[in-house]
């Protein structure tokens, strides 16, 4: 099946076509041509006002059931849904059980998304057991792939805890 996108604005800062309007020809799910005016007998032609095309989007607040609540949603199902919705990157909240509060839990999440269309960027817990009392191993989790820290919807009353946490990252 072939699809022709007419006059699509390309949003991709790694491309020579960034913020430029072009026609895009897609054959069997693969972009085969990008040009000013493609005249092709495509199976489907989309000529929509304000059409934009990009590599993918990032969702900065995602919650899956796994680990711990797989009956709600598994990581693989969540990643499939994210990809089908156009998200190639997701920040996964630390609201699972066990909590994302150590190196191996961050590695587990990164490993689960390794060969998937959507990639997980874990938000790890700032404090052990989300208690707001003792910091987790922030440096270790950062080296494992955590991109942010927080105790998901729990207030951290000790501002020095936040300052120390920030200094460790």
What are these regions (language model features)?
Residues 1-40:
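N-terminal metal-binding scaffold of metallo-dependent hydrolase/deaminase domains
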Residues 11, 93, 152:
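Conserved residues at the C-terminal ends of beta-strands
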Residues 37-53:
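Active-site metal-binding motif and surrounding structural segment of the metallo-beta-lactamase
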Residues 8, 24, 29, 50, ...:
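Divalent metal-coordination and catalytic microenvironments
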Residues 96-108, 113-168:
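Histidine/acidic-residue-rich, glycine-tolerant segments that coordinate divalent metal ions
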Residues 49-113:
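Metal-associated gating/positioning segment near the N- to mid-region
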Residues 5, 44-46, 58, 91, ...:
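Hydrophobic/aromatic beta-strand patches that form the interior of the parallel beta-sheet core
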